[in-house]
Regions:
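Active-site recognition of the HExxH zinc-binding catalytic motif
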Residues: 190-202
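Short pre-active-site segment immediately N-terminal to the catalytic Zn-binding motif
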Residues: 176-192
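Catalytic or ion-translocation cores adjacent to nucleophile or general acid/base/metal-coordination motifs
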Residues: 202-209
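N-terminal low-structure segments adjacent to metalloprotease catalytic domains
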Residues: 1-102
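Generic preference for flexible, low-structure residues
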Residues: 148, 191-193, 208
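Auxiliary, metal-adjacent structural segments of Zn-dependent hydrolase domains
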Residues: 100-171, 181-182
C-alpha cells in the first residue's frame, strides 16, 4: 500500500507540478519516507483529499495538503488506541467521517465517546490484545503491524444508522470501533480480528492487480 501510494504521488507531482509547486527535495524525501516505514492513516486520507482538490481545481487546498503529507510522512507512528476526538486526531476527526461516508455511500456521523465509555473501551481493547498475545503471539504481532490505530468512537445522536466497526481503503491502518458495543474483551477480540482482516485484504487487492 505504501509503495502504491508513493508511486501515485510521483505521478500526481509529475502531471501537476505547476499547480502543486513541489520542491524536488520535499518530493524525494516524502517518497523515501513513505516507502521506508509505517505512516499515519492520515497520510492516505490526505492523498485522496489531494486528488479531490485537484479534480475541483482547488489548488490552494492541494498545496496545503501536499505540505501536510510531507510533514506527516516523516513520522513513524506506533500502534495506539485513541478516542475519536480532536485532541487525539486533530483535523482527521472530520476527514475520517467524511471518507468513511464516501466508501459507505451513506453519511457516517461519529462523535467523541463519553469518558466512561472511553475508559471501558480502552481497557477492553488492551485486555483483548493481551489475550490474543497469550494465545497466538504471531497473530498479535500481525495485528500491530497491519493496524496503526484503533479508534474508539460513538454514534452521533443525529446519525441515521448505527455502526459496529469501520475501516477504509482510503484510511489504511485505521480501525474505528463503536465504544458502545465493545466493552467485553471477547467481543473486542472478534472486532479487532475482523477489521484487521480488512486491512490485509486492502493490501492484497493491490497485489492481485
Amino acid at each position: 500500500m505504501r509503495c502504491a501510494l508513493a508511486d501515485s504521488l510521483t505521478h500526481v507531482a509529475a502531471v501537476s507540478a505547476d499547480n502543486l509547486k513541489v520542491a524536488e527535495a520535499d518530493l524525494t524525501g516524502a517518497l523515501s519516507e513513505i516507502r521506508a516505514h509505517r505512516i499515519s492513516p492520515g497520510v492516505f486520507g490526505r492523498y485522496y483529499d489531494l486528488v479531490f482538490a485537484f479534480a475541483a481545481e482547488r489548488h490552494d487546498d492541494a498545496q496545503r495538503l501536499w505540505r501536510e503529507i510531507v510533514r506527516l510522512a516523516r513520522k513513524q507512528p506506533q500502534f495506539s488506541i485513541l478516542p475519536y476526538d480532536e485532541g487525539a486526531l486533530g483535523p482527521d476527526t472530520e476527514r475520517y467521517a467524511r471518507l468513511l461516508s464516501l466508501e459507505a455511500e451513506s453519511t457516517v456521523v461519529l462523535t467523541a465517546p463519553r469518558e466512561e465509555e472511553w475508559v471501558r473501551f480502552k481497557e477492553s481493547a488492551t485486555a483483548a490484545l493481551a489475550l490474543i498475545e497469550a494465545a497466538d503471539a504471531a497473530l498479535a504481532s500481525e495485528i500491530r503491524e497491519l493496524v496503526i490505530e484503533v479508534v474508539g468512537a460513538s454514534r452521533s445522536a443525529h446519525a441515521g444508522r448505527g455502526f459496529g466497526g469501520a475501516s477504509s481503503f482510503m484510511l489504511w491502518g485505521s480501525v474505528l470501533l463503536n465504544t458502545e458495543y465493545y466493552d467485553a474483551k471477547l467481543d473486542m477480540m472478534a472486532a479487532l480480528l475482523h477489521e484487521t482482516a480488512h486491512q490485509l485484504l486492502f493490501g492484497l487487492s493491490l497485489v492481485s492487480r
